[in-house]
Amino acid sequence: MSWDQVWIDVNVATMDPSISAPYGAITNAAIAVKDGKIAWLGPRSELPAFDVLSIPVYRGKGGWITPGLIDAHTHLVFAGNRANEFELRLKGATYEEIARAGGGIISTVNACREADEAELFDLGRQRLNALAKEGVTTVEIKSGYGLDTETELKILRVARELGQHHHVDVKTTFLGAHAVPPEFKDNSDGYVDLIINKMLPAVIAENLADAVDVFCENIAFNLEQTERVLSAAKAAGLQVKLHAEQLSNMGGSELAARLGAKSVDHIEYLDEAGVKALSESGTCAVLLPGAFYFLRETQKPPIDLLRQYGVPMVLASDFNPGSSPICSTLLMLNMGCTLFRLTPEEALAGLTLNAAKALGIEENVGSLVVGKQADFCLWDIATPAQLAYSYGVNPCKDVVKNGKLVHQ
C-alpha cells in the first residue's frame, strides 16, 4: 500500500455514530493517511501490508486518538480586557447592569476601534496558539467588537488572516448585531438598517464571513430585528446562527429553527417548544459552560429535553473578554460534565462531530472515517473519559492536521 504515514499501537475514538461502541471506539487500532485524508482505519490486525522502510510509522504507545477538536463559538479577536468588570460583578453588579451602563461589549468595542490589524493579529495568534496546544484543529471566530463598518471588517480580515497563517482552520462569523453602539443608542432600528444595507454588503464583497450571527436578547436585538438581519444573510447565501435564550426566553430558538439556522447558542432559558423546534429543523444547540460559570449563572440549559428530542449538543469555549475569558476547550469538557451533567462521551461529541455540524463541515471533519480529512490528536490517556475528568496537565501529545504532523 502507498500511504503517507501510518499510526499504530493506538486506540481510536472515531466518534463515528455508525460504530455502536462508546465513542465509536476501535481498540488496538491503526490509521493510514494519504493526501491529507484518512485512507485506512480499523483494527491493527487487519491493516494491509505496507513498506515500513518507505512509509513513516508513528507509534502511539497505547494512547488514544480522537478527531481534532473543534471550537464552534469564539470571539477571540479583540483588544483590551475587562478585569475591572470582573471586580464589579464580584461586588454584586449584574451582566445586564454593566452593559446598560455602557460597559460590557461597548468597552471592548472602544478598544478594538483603536487597535490596528497588526495588534489584533498578534493578540489573536496568541489565543489561537493556546487552543491549538489543546488539540483544536478548527475554530470559529466572530466579529462583533466593532459595531461600525470599518472595525467589523477589520476584525473579520484579521480572523481570515489568522486562518491563512496558522494550521488551525478558521471559520468566520459576522456578528455586527452583537450590541447597539453608542451612536445608535436611541435608534436600534437605524443600526439594523446599517447592518443590512452597508455592513453586510461590505462583508460579502470581501468574502469575509462564512455565517452571520445575532445576539437576540432584551439588552441587544428583538425578534423582529433579528429576523431582518438573518433573512438578509440567508438571501445572500450565508449560513445563519443565533445567540439566544441566555438571559430570558424571547423565542429566539424557534426563530432560528424556522430560518434553518446551523446553531442556537447559550440557550439557558430554552423551553420545550424551542427544543422541539430545534429537533425538527436539525439545528444544533451550542452549550457555553464557560460563560455560565464565569457569570455565576444558575439557570441551566435543558439537557434532558435536548437528549429526549435528539438535538445535537455542542460544547464551545465562547472565549471572549467579558463573559468567558477562558481560552481552553479541555476545561469546557470538564465544565460540560460537572456543570451541565453531560456524559464524557456527549462532551467529546460536542467538541468534535456535533461541533462540525454546527459549522456545516461535518462531511469533512468531526469524526474519523475513511475519506474524511486527516485531522486528529493523540492523547496520553487511558480512556477517552479522562479528557473530561482531569484538568491542568495537557495530555495532547501529537496533532495531525490535513495529514501533516503539526504538533509533537
UniProtKB/Swiss-Prot annotation:
Role: Catalyzes the hydrolytic cleavage of the carbon-nitrogen bond in imidazolone-5-propanoate to yield N-formimidoyl-L-glutamate. It is the third step in the universal histidine degradation pathway.
Residues the record lists as binding Fe(3+): H73, H75, H243, D318
Zinc as UniProt keyword: yes
Keywords assigned by UniProt, alphabetized: Cytoplasm, Histidine metabolism, Hydrolase, Iron, Metal-binding, Zinc
Enzyme class: hydrolase
Identification of the protein by name: Imidazolonepropionase
InterPro entries: Amidohydro-rel, HutI, Metal-dep_hydrolase_composite, Metal_Hydrolase
Phylogenetic classification of the source organism: Bacteria, Pseudomonadati, Pseudomonadota, Gammaproteobacteria, Alteromonadales
Family affiliation: Belongs to the metallo-dependent hydrolases superfamily. HutI family.
UniProt-annotated binding residues for 4-imidazolone-5-propanoate: R82, Y145, H178, Q246, S323
Single GO BP term: L-histidine catabolic process to glutamate and formamide
Organism: Shewanella sp. (strain MR-4)
Reaction(s) catalysed (UniProt annotation): 4-imidazolone-5-propanoate + H2O = N-formimidoyl-L-glutamate
